[in-house]
Amino acid sequence: MIHKKTPENTITYNNLQLGTLQSANAFNPLKINLFYKDFNTVIILDNRLAEIFKIDFNTLSSYKDVSHMSTGHDNTIWVFNQNLQKLELFDYKSRTTRAQTVPVQNAVLDLTSNYNSCWLLTENYLYQYNYFGSMVKKIENKVISNIEKNDNEDQYELVTENEAIRT
């Protein structure tokens, strides 16, 4: 269940048919992304929490088994396709893949993005990609467990067991 509170009222979105919400991304408040992993579905909401797009990856001609999702630029989302072990930049309006990475050899721990970059955290590496899907950086991972965005800043923290490292 998603709530949006304003001084005047509270707006709620809930989709019981899709089960448990795996992740929500409100980087762009005009296109809020909700990922329901159990049903392999992404819902795009507008700023009033009205459903504007529904992407059911089970019904696409090129089936995708998505394990992680994050916001992209324009009408795209970043998805990690478990079947191919690839990160993909997916255009949800045209229902096509704009970019694909080479297969990732390790288990994926986290995925986050902004308009310019996407970070894919695996057991052994942290990968950074630009908005075209080209790898910019590959850093060995020995202690990072997830990536968190600072609320008031355009920075990310790499979270370890004992501390947070700013990027």
Regions found by a protein language model. Name each.
Residues 5-8, 46-50, 91-95, 130-134:
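Short loop/turn segments that connect beta-strands within beta-propeller blades
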Residues 18-26, 62-71, 105-115, 142-153:
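Repeated scaffold domains used in trafficking and secretory/extracellular systems
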Residues 34-93, 100:
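Surface-exposed, polar helix/loop patches in the mature regions of secreted/periplasmic/lumenal proteins
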Residues 12-17, 56-62, 99-105, 137-143:
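Surface loop/turn motifs at the tips and blade-to-blade linkers of beta-strand repeat domains
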Residues 1-31:
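Start-of-domain marker
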Residues 127-167:
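Intrinsically disordered, low-complexity segments enriched in Gly and acidic/Ser/Thr residues
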